[in-house]
């Protein structure tokens, strides 16, 4: 019993001490209301008016108007509505204002000129200018090829493929090759002739004697005399006498 009564007594002492602390705090607040407000406990003194919130100065003038704008949760421009009709009308007006453009092909001087996205009004003006050209050419100057302007506003026209001039170029390249082949023997003969002349000059300069045997003086050969054989030209032939 004594053990069970002890905790109860301790709890009672704590309750009385807490109640005394609260009573002392309330008395202090009543006596010093301004000091309690400065503590930041949210307790106002007697006769004290509530303080107004400090006014803030906006440095951005357009910020207030932007905050006032309300968000439109159901915009009319979304989906198929009036905005689509306005967009279609503006696109149609833009197409009407923009001139029609097609492909233009011009044949002049043996050349084919193709222009893409050429305005129709400019094509008509160009055709009128070509039709006003003088058909009579000057006598001294060569007559240029007539210009042919075709307007492709109705249907596109296929551009003719250029004709290849490869066989003509090969024939022109073979002509000088053949001419050089015919000139090669003559050139070789001329170079061989020059080489022989230079060689002859070098031989004449190196050898002290005359090269050609026709220019040399003939040497006279003396008849050989060999008396010891008795068959030479100086030998005396004695006639043989026959006995009667």
UniProtKB/Swiss-Prot annotation:
InterPro entries: CCT_CS, TIFY/JAZ, Tify_dom. It comes from the Eukaryota. Residues 97-132 form the Tify domain. Induction: By jasmonate, wounding, and cold, drought and salt stresses. Down-regulated by abscisic acid (ABA). PROSITE patterns: TIFY. A motif (Jas) lies at residues 185-210. Residues 194-204 have a biased composition (Basic and acidic residues). One of its GO terms (cellular component) is nucleus. Repressor of jasmonate responses. Disulfide bonds: none annotated. A motif (Nuclear localization signal) lies at residues 187-194. The jas domain (185-210) is required for interaction with COI1. This is Protein TIFY 10b. Ubiquitinated. Targeted for degradation by the SCF(COI1) E3 ubiquitin ligase-proteasome pathway during jasmonate signaling. It is found in: Nucleus. The keyword Transcription applies. Belongs to the TIFY/JAZ family. Keywords: Jasmonic acid signaling pathway, Nucleus, Transcription, Transcription regulation, Ubl conjugation. The keyword Magnesium does not apply. Interacts with BHLH148. Interacts with COI1A and COI1B in a coronatine-dependent manner. Coronatine is an analog of jasmonoyl isoleucine (JA-Ile). Residues 174-244 are annotated as: Disordered. The lineage of its organism: Eukaryota, Viridiplantae, Streptophyta, Embryophyta, Tracheophyta. GO terms for biological process: regulation of defense response; regulation of jasmonic acid mediated signaling pathway; response to wounding. SMART domains: TIFY. It comes from Oryza sativa subsp. japonica.
């Amino acid at each position: 019993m004594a053990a069970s009564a002890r905790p109860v007594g301790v709890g009672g002492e704590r309750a009385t001490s807490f109640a005394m602390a609260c009573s002392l705090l309330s008395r202090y607040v009543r006596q010093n209301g301004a000091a309690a407000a400065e503590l930041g406990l949210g307790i106002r003194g007697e006769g004290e008016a509530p303080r107004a919130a400090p006014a803030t100065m906006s440095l951005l003038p357009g910020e207030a108007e932007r905050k006032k704008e309300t968000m439109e949760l159901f915009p009319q421009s979304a989906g198929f509505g009036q905005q689509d009709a306005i967009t279609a009308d503006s696109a149609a007006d833009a197409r009407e204002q923009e001139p029609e453009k097609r492909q233009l092909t011009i044949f002049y001087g043996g050349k084919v000129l193709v222009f893409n996205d050429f305005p129709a009004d400019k094509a008509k003006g160009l055709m009128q200018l070509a039709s006003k050209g003088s058909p009579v050419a000057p006598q001294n100057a060569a007559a240029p090829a007539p210009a042919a302007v075709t307007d492709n506003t109705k249907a596109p026209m296929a551009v003719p493929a250029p004709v290849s001039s490869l066989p003509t170029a090969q024939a022109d390249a073979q002509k000088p090759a053949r001419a050089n082949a015919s000139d090669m023997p003559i050139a070789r003969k001329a170079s061989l002739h020059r080489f022989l002349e230079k060689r002859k000059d070098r031989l004449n300069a190196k050898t002290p004697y005359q090269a050609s045997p026709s220019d040399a003086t003939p040497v006279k050969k003396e008849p050989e005399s060999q008396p010891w054989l008795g068959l030479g030209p100086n030998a005396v032939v004695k006639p043989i006498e026959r006995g009667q």
